[in-house]
């Protein structure tokens, strides 16, 4: 490394210091998903980011998805994926595979990546320590032909109804980094598959996290000129949904951000997980995505 490169690195570290102080002993929940999960280089960079957060005195918690991997496993096992209103129908056989893929293979891959940095990650799902309880999701759609609201039966797709933070509080006092799969039990004894975004929002809300980061395949919320909006209040975000600036798949993402803020999260960020070290760029600089605040 040349002296000029060393000087640049030193300046970057000095610039990061105020942000390290700002977030010291604070909880940051990161929802890991999208393209980054299928790219080994991005996966390694993500693990390094999480490790550095922990080494900087921050309490990081990872929640991950795995829709494409679930679809691939179902296909491999000859089980056809069924969708209602764009949502996967999870029958009894499918939920077993969902749990196997999410809480098994994907979860342990992420744990292994973080552990390779020298940090200690622990793989969990909502069942562990009675951390999360869910109930059957209640979803409706408007029938385009009759314009009548129709109730969807999505099987074992759930919604979070309760989060017990006891286990996560214990882990926060330890050297462990929780990596959580969005699978949880119901009071009825069933196992439920939960949308990873809403699961992460529920976890972050229960912990009153300082930040919730959503790693996506887009830079953040864009204005009508396709320029990144750096910060929005909840009321501004709602206005952009109403006027059509926020549209399509970004609407449920932003609504999940709003729900998380209502639950107690101080700020939620939508950022591009395809950018290497995007988590560090968001936390230790002036920001890399769209920050939504109360």
Curated annotation (Swiss-Prot):
Pfam families: AA_kinase. It catalyses: N-acetyl-L-glutamate + ATP = N-acetyl-L-glutamyl 5-phosphate + ADP. Keywords: Amino-acid biosynthesis, Arginine biosynthesis, ATP-binding, Cytoplasm, Kinase, Nucleotide-binding, Transferase. One of its GO terms (cellular component) is cytoplasm. CDD domains: AAK_NAGK-C. It is found in: Cytoplasm. GO terms for molecular function: acetylglutamate kinase activity; ATP binding. Its main location: cytoplasm. The record marks 31, 253 as: Transition state stabilizer. Its EC number is 2.7.2.8. Substrate binds at residues 66-67, 88, 193. Catalyzes the ATP-dependent phosphorylation of N-acetyl-L-glutamate. This is Acetylglutamate kinase. It comes from Agrobacterium fabrum (strain C58 / ATCC 33970) (Agrobacterium tumefaciens (strain C58)). The gene is argB.
């Amino acid at each position: 490394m040349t002296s000029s490169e060393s000087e640049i690195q030193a300046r970057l570290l000095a610039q990061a210091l105020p942000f390290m102080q700002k977030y010291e002993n604070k909880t940051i929940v990161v929802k890991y998903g999208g393209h980054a999960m299928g790219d080994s280089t991005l996966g390694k960079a993500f693990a390094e980011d999480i490790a550095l957060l922990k080494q900087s005195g921050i309490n990081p918690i990872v929640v991950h998805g795995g829709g494409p991997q679930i679809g691939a496993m179902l296909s491999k096992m000859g089980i056809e994926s069924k969708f209602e209103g764009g949502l996967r129908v999870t029958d009894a056989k499918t939920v077993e595979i969902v749990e196997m893929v999410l809480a098994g293979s994907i979860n342990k891959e992420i744990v292994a990546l973080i552990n390779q940095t020298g940090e200690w990650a622990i793989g969990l799902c909502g069942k562990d320590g009675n951390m999360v309880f869910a109930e059957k999701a209640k979803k409706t759609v408007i029938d385009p032909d009759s314009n009548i609201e129709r109730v969807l039966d999505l099987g074992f797709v759930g919604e979070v109804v309760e989060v017990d933070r006891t286990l996560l509080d214990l882990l926060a006092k330890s050297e462990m980094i929780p990596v959580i799969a969005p699978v949880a039990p119901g009071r009825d004894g069933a196992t439920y598959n939960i949308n990873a975004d809403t699961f992460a929002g529920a976890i972050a809300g229960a912990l009153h996290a300082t930040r919730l980061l959503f790693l996506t395949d887009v830079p953040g919320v864009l204005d009508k000129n396709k320029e990144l909006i750096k910060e929005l209040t909840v009321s501004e975000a709602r206005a952009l949904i109403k006027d059509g600036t926020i549209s399509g798949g970004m609407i449920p993402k932003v609504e999940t951000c709003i729900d998380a803020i209502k639950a107690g999260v101080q700020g939620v960020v939508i950022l591009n997980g395809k950018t290497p070290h995007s988590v560090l760029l968001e936390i230790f600089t002036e920001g890399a995505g769209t920050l939504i605040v109360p």
